[in-house]
Regions:
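Short, hydrophobic/aliphatic alpha-helical segments
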Residues: 29-41, 71-74
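Conserved phosphate/anionic-ligand binding catalytic regions in large, soluble enzymes, centered on
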Residues: 39-57
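A structural-propensity feature for long, helix-poor, extended segments
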Residues: 72, 76-115
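A conserved regulatory-domain signal marking ACT and ACT-like small-molecule sensing domains
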Residues: 122, 150-250
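Intrinsically disordered, low-complexity segments enriched in serine/proline and basic residues
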Residues: 4, 19-20
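Non-transmembrane, aqueous-exposed alpha-helical and coiled segments at domain scale
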Residues: 63-72, 120, 139
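Intrinsic-disorder-associated, low-complexity terminal segments enriched in Asp/Asn/His/Tyr and depleted
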Residues: 2-3, 8, 26
Length: 250
């Protein structure tokens, strides 16, 4: 057992502590977001620097759509300043291996990555006007698929995907989410919304971004339920659609 592991509280003990605190809250307090009060059940000393970092890695892996073969992680702000002391580095790697914040293997993520054959390297991110708990992940999957993710840890174990391959995204991975990169031309939005309507899938939120008129654009569509894989493949074949990335809650 290395010195790093002593930073962590055993998850079951942490959960019991939280239940004890919750039992003392009155009903009005219980209406608050519990994560805002005491944070998630997790392995690690910080909901922002550890639990949120695990979530960033986990969601990024799912967006890549396959196991990560290699990754470059560029830390920014307080992530960079306290990355080792709060276990942010190990937490990110743990998430990229598919671990959740309460996984007892989080302190040993580097060793687990070696077993899995996943290589990783850390550096400093050069970002402007970014959240202080930000990271850039440049991932390569087993098939050779690549994806760049810029993400931020918001506190309480919550996180946000800020950009995908340089395009705005801004979603928190709390719904099944379609990220559609397309040409900015008439009909692309209708193609996506019509397909979802035919599938009986309600749209929770819809964000649209473009770099210029007629240039590159992106749709971020948070859905009330999962989108079937065959429908995603169908979307990718439509005129004007360049790439579809999907975050599944399953």
């Amino acid at each position: 057992m290395d010195n790093f592991s002593f930073l962590y509280m055993e998850p079951k003990k942490y959960a019991r502590m939280k239940l004890s605190i919750l039992g003392k809250l009155d009903m009005k307090e219980k209406e608050m977001n519990i994560f805002d009060i005491i944070g998630p059940v997790m392995v690690g000393p910080s909901s922002s620097h550890t639990a949120g970092a695990v979530r960033i890695g986990f969601v990024s892996r799912k967006l890549l759509g396959e196991p990560v073969k290699s990754v470059q992680l560029l830390l920014y702000g307080s992530f960079l300043a306290t990355g080792k002391g709060h276990g942010t580095d190990r937490a990110l790697v743990a998430g990229l291996l598919g671990m959740q914040p309460d996984d007892e293997r989080v302190p040993y993520a580097f060793e687990e990555a070696k077993k899995a054959g996943m290589t990783f390297a850390f550096g400093e991110a050069n970002l402007k006007e970014a959240h202080p708990n930000s990271v850039v992940l440049n991932m390569v999957g087993l098939s050779g698929r690549t994806l760049e993710v810029i993400a931020a840890s918001l506190g309480g174990g919550r996180m946000k995907i800020c950009k995908l391959d340089g395009m705005e995204a801004n979603f928190c991975a709390e719904y099944p989410t379609l990220i559609v990169q397309n040409v900015d031309q008439p009909g692309c939005v209708a193609t996506v919304t019509t397909l979802l309507s035919l599938l009986g899938i309600n749209i929770a939120t819809l964000q649209l971004y473009r770099d210029s008129r007629g240039g590159d654009a992106v749709m971020v569509v948070e859905c009330d339920r999962e989108v079937p894989g065959e429908s995603i493949s169908l979307l990718e074949k439509q005129d004007g659609i360049e790439r579809v990335t999907y975050y599944s809650m399953e």
